[in-house]
Amino acid sequence: MNDSVAIMKKGDVLRFKLELALKNSWTKETSSDKENWTPDNPAWGQCAVTALVVNDYLGGEIIWANTVLPDGRKVSHYFNKIDGREVDLTRDQFPEGAVIPSGTPRRKGFSSTREYILSYPETWRRYRLLKQRVQEFLKLLGETSI
């Protein structure tokens, strides 16, 4: 039992470091909405590329949901499901009162949601930039095992 507790703790540490690295790597250049991105809402427009990076490091699947904002507008949103649990590191981009459904995979003819997201060249570019920044940040934290 002690071995599984140690593994869980290591996984929790990795997730903490990854979340810290992501939040410190988000910029206007990694956002899908550069015009409305601000340092006050750094998660804005980061959901697809963040879900891809989380998938790289933690596995699981990428999920899509049509988020309903308090004013009734619907916004496309991606997050992760890992070991049956929702992991949404960009939920904070939405105002209080936004409703994010449980979501589904979004493939649109591709074999996975990941492949669908990466079929967009601009998203691919933003993903590569974010992943590079995250890798550099993790190295600064002394994380060499990933």
Language-model regions, residue ranges each:
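A structural boundary/capping signal
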Residues: 1-146
